[in-house]
């Protein structure tokens, strides 16, 4: 399947006319243009996407390397991912709609240094276990249920996870099945889409949110959502992996689970001018509590210092459920017809093992994007953001003493925050075909000021079918 999708990607631009658009170009569509029409009136939903990312970096300063280091020699890698989205409206009652959703996906290629050595890795599409191969798999299978609490309806954008084009203004929604939690939580219209926006996974998702997921980023979960005009509350209960960054899930929820609560207000703060308050904006606050068989950094350091282990090993502990918790905050605001800004903050307690997403205990990000409509390119976009990531003292000491995480481990650590600047230009070539040019500057890769800095260049081709 993946090879067929990628062949169509490469074939598509050959049939297009010049990408030049004059000042009289039409306004952007409600959603990104696609290769084929997606009729909103149909009971079925059928779409697809393919994303090909080429990344490279030149040699950079590095007095030493460990098993989990970003390689200091120059390297280049290509990742590929293709998805087929399907859905069917089982019940079309406006107040009590029911959808069945099935998505098939295939991922191939590699990440730089096998996606090791960076807390904020440069490519969200990379699977962190290359031995899984590129065999297609069922990424999502879920049921979506709407329970209307009013007869007043509001227009809604059709998505692969919600097929309705209108929904009750006050409603409950439920999703049950296999999904990725960032499909529904911690969304941000400026920086959550590695297909058309930023590539770095500590920008596209809150890096300190150690959300329940297997290696591919999916879990079995139940999500409940309450919406009332410009306010939404969400709760998610999800299965954790059996081991850190593992492909298998633990279904004994008494032993392991991920619980998440999010509150969202789609209204500009009162400190804004009246003009800004009338533009689109949102504030989201997220809290999570994970239970799993996670190691304790301080305990492993003490065992090493007592001479009981040759190096600190976060996985070498008696099986026992432990708890990890954290909070996240993200804010976005439209400031003009074409310009938007956002900020993001995340924190977790950091004492226990980074388990499912990445090795970040605190993150702060700020950036924005600008649509090039004024330049006759209504579907082109430029974006830039800065993110700074950190880990707690016990995590720092663990890495300094030679401990390995599932992503990091230089064999030593001269600690500093990992700082990243990313900028991209996304060029709309024809219908659903896009090319992006992306640059990422990374200071202190893997929190190590002895190494780097490093510049990562990327070219992305994306097709929406």
Task: Describe the predicted segments one by one.
Residues 44, 78-84, 137-143, 172, ...:
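Hydrophobic, lipid-facing positions within transmembrane beta-strands of outer-membrane proteins
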Residues 88-92, 145-147, 178, 225-228, ...:
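Residue-level signature of outer-membrane beta-barrel architecture
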Residues 34-46, 58-59, 87-100, 148-171, ...:
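Short loop/turn motifs that connect adjacent beta-strands in outer-membrane beta-barrel proteins
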Residues 264-265, 286-321, 349, 353-442:
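Outer membrane beta-barrel transmembrane domains
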Residues 116-133, 137, 152-264, 313, ...:
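Surface-exposed coil loops of outer-membrane beta-barrel proteins
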Residues 50-56, 102-106, 174-178, 235-239, ...:
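Transmembrane beta-barrel strands of outer-membrane/channel proteins
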């Amino acid at each position: 399947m993946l090879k067929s999708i990628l062949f169509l990607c490469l074939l598509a631009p050959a049939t297009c006319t010049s990408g030049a658009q004059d000042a009289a170009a039409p306004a952007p569509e409600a959603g990104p243009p696609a290769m084929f029409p997606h009729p909103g009136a149909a009971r079925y939903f059928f779409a697809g996407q393919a994303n090909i990312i080429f990344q490279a970096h030149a040699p950079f300063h590095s007095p030493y390397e460990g098993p989990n280091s970003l390689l200091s020699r120059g390297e280049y890698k290509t990742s590929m991912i293709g998805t087929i989205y399907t859905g069917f409206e089982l019940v079309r009652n406006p107040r009590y709609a029911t959808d069945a959703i099935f998505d098939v996906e295939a991922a191939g290629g590699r990440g730089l240094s096998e996606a090791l050595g960076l807390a904020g890795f440069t490519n969200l599409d990379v699977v962190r276990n290359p031995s899984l191969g590129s065999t297609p798999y069922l990424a999502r299978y879920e049921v979506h249920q709407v329970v209307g609490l009013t007869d007043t309806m509001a227009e809604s954008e059709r998505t692969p996870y919600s097929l309705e084009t209108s929904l009750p203004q006050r409603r409950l929604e439920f999703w049950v099945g296999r999904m990725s939690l960032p499909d529904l939580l911690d969304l941000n219209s400026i920086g959550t889409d590695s297909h058309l926006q930023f590539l770095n996974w500590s920008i596209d998702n809150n890096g300190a949110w150690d959300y329940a997921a297997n290696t591919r980023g999916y879990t079995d979960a139940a999500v409940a959502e309450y919406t009332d005009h410009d306010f939404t509350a969400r709760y998610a209960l999800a299965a954790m992996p059996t081991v850190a960054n593992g492909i298998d899930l633990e279904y004994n929820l008494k032993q392991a689970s991920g619980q998440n609560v999010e509150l969202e207000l789609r209204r500009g703060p009162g400190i804004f001018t009246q003009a800004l308050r009338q533009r689109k904006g949102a504030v989201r606050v997220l809290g999570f509590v994970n239970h799993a068989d996670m190691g304790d950094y301080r305990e492993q350091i003490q065992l090493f210092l007592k001479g009981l282990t040759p190096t600190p090993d976060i996985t070498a502990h008696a099986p026992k459920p432990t708890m990890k918790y954290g909070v996240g905050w993200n804010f976005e605001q439209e400031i003009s017809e074409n310009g938007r800004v956002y900020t993001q903050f995340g924190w977790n307690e950091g004492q226990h093992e980074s388990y499912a997403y990445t090795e970040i205990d605190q993150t702060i990000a700020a950036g924005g994007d600008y649509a090039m409509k004024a330049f006759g390119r209504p579907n082109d976009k430029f974006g830039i953001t800065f993110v700074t990531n950190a880990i707690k003292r016990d995590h720092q000491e663990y890495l300094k003493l030679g401990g390995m995480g599932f992503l990091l481990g230089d064999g030593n650590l001269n600690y500093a925050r990992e700082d990243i600047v990313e900028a991209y230009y996304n060029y709309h070539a024809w219908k659903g075909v896009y090319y992006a040019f992306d640059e990422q500057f990374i200071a202190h890769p893997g929190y190590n000021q002895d190494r780097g800095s490093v510049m990562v260049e990327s070219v992305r081709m994306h097709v929406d079918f």
